[in-house]
């Protein structure tokens, strides 16, 4: 998080985590080391797996209808699968008894015939969500740009472009009464999923770039994900007032 200092006219980070420093993580095991201990490596993989499942499960402790955003990519597919796993169990029985209601709904948005929609449909069929595929036209996207800029409060071209489909998707989600959605946002920054990460010259350069990307999430990807969806899921249609 950040706080604003008026006299300086800029934002300040209010905390620094130890993992932000390369020296704090440089000795972590990974398969690239010739002397890697298989048991230790598997223990760390299991720890990440368990932490991710626990994080998703924690978000499902909600008293409002929820769903998942499913693009068909690895990140959103994993989150959707975990959400389906726990949404299918009753919390009050410590996830032992099956839950017959509510059923988990997944949502995908794109131009008609987009490859991502096909992949999202396949994943939804595999994990068993009630899937909703929302198509929009180029003209609908252009018509929405004014409202998108109003809600996300930025003129950054890339952010506006990526926010427009999410805004159109949010309108459909809201009309269905869904109040909360999970997505795979942030995974590429945490795990170095972008293609250019493969060209990192050193482990330190890789780590420093992931930290840099994480520190800027609130300006771009999270700005898009939070504001383009939250403006419709949690507020009135302010742009029409």
Ranges and model annotations:
Residues 1-39:
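N-terminal segments that mediate ammonia production and transfer
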Residues 27-236:
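ATP-dependent adenylate-handling active sites, centered on carboxylate activation for C-N bond formation
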Residues 237-241:
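A short, hydrophobic C-terminal helix/tail in secreted or cell-surface proteins
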């Amino acid at each position: 998080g950040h706080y604003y200092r008026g006299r300086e006219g800029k934002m300040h980070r209010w905390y620094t985590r130890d993992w932000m420093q390369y020296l704090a993580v440089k000795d972590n095991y990974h398969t690239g080391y010739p002397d890697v201990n298989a048991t230790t490596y598997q223990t760390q993989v299991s720890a990440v797996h368990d932490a991710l499942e626990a994080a998703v499960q924690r978000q499902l402790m909600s008293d409002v209808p929820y769903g998942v955003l499913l693009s068909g990519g690895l990140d959103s597919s994993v989150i959707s699968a975990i959400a389906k796993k726990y949404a299918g169990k009753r919390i009050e029985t410590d996830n032992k008894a099956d839950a017959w209601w509510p059923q988990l709904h997944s949502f995908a948005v794109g131009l008609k015939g987009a490859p991502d929609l096909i992949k999202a449909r396949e994943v939804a069929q595999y994990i068993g969500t009630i899937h909703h595929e929302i198509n929009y036209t180029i003209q609908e996207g252009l018509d929405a740009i004014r409202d998108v800029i109003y809600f996300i409060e930025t003129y950054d071209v890339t952010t506006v472009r990526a926010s427009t489909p999410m805004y159109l998707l949010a309108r459909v989600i809201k009309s269905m009464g869904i109040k909360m959605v999970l997505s795979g946002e942030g995974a590429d920054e945490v795990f170095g999923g972008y293609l250019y990460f493969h060209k990192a010259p050193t482990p330190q350069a890789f780590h420093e770039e992931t930290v840099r990307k994480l520190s800027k999430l609130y300006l771009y990807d999270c700005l898009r994900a939070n504001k383009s969806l939250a403006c419709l899921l949690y507020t009135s249609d302010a742009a029409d007032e």
